[in-house]
């Protein structure tokens, strides 16, 4: 095969059309974190705001840990197995993580997590608990997001990845803005 024929192959266009949005999606967090930090630094107690955000997100990401492998699982099995079985399995996994999230956040288990594991107290503990209560659904959404991104990759529908990445970015900024302007920390 000649060098010129190598790049006329449609594979390279499809690969780039998937690689670019997925790469941006993976690195959007590095871009979004300083923006969110800039909101938190403007609060009346920046150290508290950043600490509350960090602890809350750590707990939520721990609960949603399966989301890190859902994308791979979907990519590997989506074309060779029943799509309904895969959708059901992922939905079941998302529901299980949601139930765990509800149990940890809305039961006395939150006392063990916040007091014993993270050692929070006073105003920080109250704010972390409030942050967890308004974001308890994040593990559910993360699992579904990774599943749908994987379907987009397998079906070569990069426009869905762009839509998901851009809308996630916009909603994150919008949500942070609303919380900031409503003075949520009080």
PLM feature segments, named:
Residues 1-22, 75-138, 178-186:
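Short alpha-helical transmembrane segments in multi-pass integral membrane proteins
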Residues 11-18, 37-61, 123-127, 186:
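Interfacial/gating helices of multi-pass transporter permease domains
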Residues 18-26, 60-61, 135, 161:
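Residue-level signature of transmembrane alpha-helical cores of multipass secondary-active transporters
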Residues 21, 25, 29-33, 64, ...:
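Alpha-helical transmembrane segments of multipass membrane proteins
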Residues 23, 27-51, 115-120, 180-183:
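Helix-terminus/linker motif at the lipid-water interface of multi-pass membrane proteins
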Residues 48, 159, 169-186:
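Membrane-interface helix-loop junctions in multi-pass transport and translocation proteins
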Residues 52-101, 145-156, 160:
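Small-residue-rich hydrophobic transmembrane alpha-helices
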Residues 68-71, 134-153, 161-171, 186:
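Short runs within selected transmembrane alpha-helices of multi-pass transporters and secretion channels
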